[in-house]
Amino acid sequence: MTAEIIDGKAFAARLRERVGALAEKFEAAAGRKPGLAVVLVGEDPASEVYVRNKGKATLAANMESFEYKLPADTTAQDLLALVKKLNGDPAVDGILVQLPLPDHLDEQSIIAAISPDKDVDGFHVINAGRLSVGQRGFVPCTPLGCMMLLADRLGDLSGLEAVVIGRSNIVGKPMAQLLLDANATVTIAHSRTRNLPEVVKRADIVVAAVGRAEMVKPEWLKDGATVIDVGINRLPPEPGKERGRLVGDVDFGRASEVAAAITPVPGGVGPMTIAVLLRNTLVAAHRNEGIDLPEDAI
């Protein structure tokens, strides 16, 4: 068996195209474009790349991009004041504070200061609570992107066995909740799970989100499983090379001989995250203006 490659890059491109078309319609109805504000504190090179990419994608989707770059020694008081200002700005529909923050800033208190209605990252405890009880809110971008890929590949997930490896608030826990809401039978596995290979072996759907390079081996997988690899890890460089390869949490090459479908790294889940961020911003804009947006439109 050779697995079908789930092309997240192509799916994300189609999603961004739909979001852009709907953003144009929103502008015609509201007299303004949807707006996304991204706040970067410090000069972390990886974060700077992420923010730059988000800005480009926002503009390409017919949205306004507001970028705020603050020095690494920014005080909590100053950062909270900026968040408060953005909460009250009618041109801003979504607010994203790029993580990680410098050590002297408490991430949870900063996220808690963002209006839940503008929390397009879905990290606010109110949005986490809304997800857990089935109320309308914002879902973290990466797990929602994973669900879109699964729905596109499998359709109805009812009754399927799903194992989520990882229990973070950003991916693992919301991913499990989304699968449960889709009527899958869900197990959350983690570092203390006993007999992890046996647990994974019974799953029709495996979502790996632990940040350990190629941890999930092919012998762990059920024949015909669908594998979503959220991990992104850089291996040590090979002799003569400056940088090592990027790999996921799954041994992709050998797992592809067992799974029915699998996401690659890179090019699988990663591109979906920014596309879903734009989708969430579009949804926030419609809600903020009281304009209907059909749920199946995006």
From Swiss-Prot:
Keyword Flavoprotein listed: no
Which biological process terms from the Gene Ontology are attached to this UniProt entry?
L-histidine biosynthetic process; methionine biosynthetic process; purine nucleotide biosynthetic process; tetrahydrofolate interconversion
Enumerate the GO terms in the molecular function aspect. Answer: methenyltetrahydrofolate cyclohydrolase activity; methylenetetrahydrofolate dehydrogenase (NADP+) activity
Q: Which CDD domains is this protein grouped with?
A: NAD_bind_m-THF_DH_Cyclohyd
Q: Which SUPFAM superfamilies match?
A: Aminoacid dehydrogenase-like, N-terminal domain (SSF53223), NAD(P)-binding Rossmann-fold domains (SSF51735)
Pathway connected to this protein: One-carbon metabolism; tetrahydrofolate interconversion
Q: Does the keyword Hydrolase apply?
A: yes
Q: Which GO terms describe its cellular component?
A: cytosol
Q: Which reaction does it catalyse?
A: (6R)-5,10-methylene-5,6,7,8-tetrahydrofolate + NADP(+) = (6R)-5,10-methenyltetrahydrofolate + NADPH; (6R)-5,10-methenyltetrahydrofolate + H2O = (6R)-10-formyltetrahydrofolate + H(+)
Q: Whom does it interact with, and what assembly results?
A: Homodimer.
> Which PANTHER family does the UniProt record give?
C-1-TETRAHYDROFOLATE SYNTHASE, CYTOPLASMIC, C-1-TETRAHYDROFOLATE SYNTHASE, CYTOPLASMIC-RELATED
Q: What does this protein do?
A: Catalyzes the oxidation of 5,10-methylenetetrahydrofolate to 5,10-methenyltetrahydrofolate and then the hydrolysis of 5,10-methenyltetrahydrofolate to 10-formyltetrahydrofolate.
| The name this protein goes by in its record | Bifunctional protein FolD
| Organism field | Erythrobacter litoralis (strain HTCC2594)
Q: What is the lineage of its organism?
A: Bacteria, Pseudomonadati, Pseudomonadota, Alphaproteobacteria, Sphingomonadales
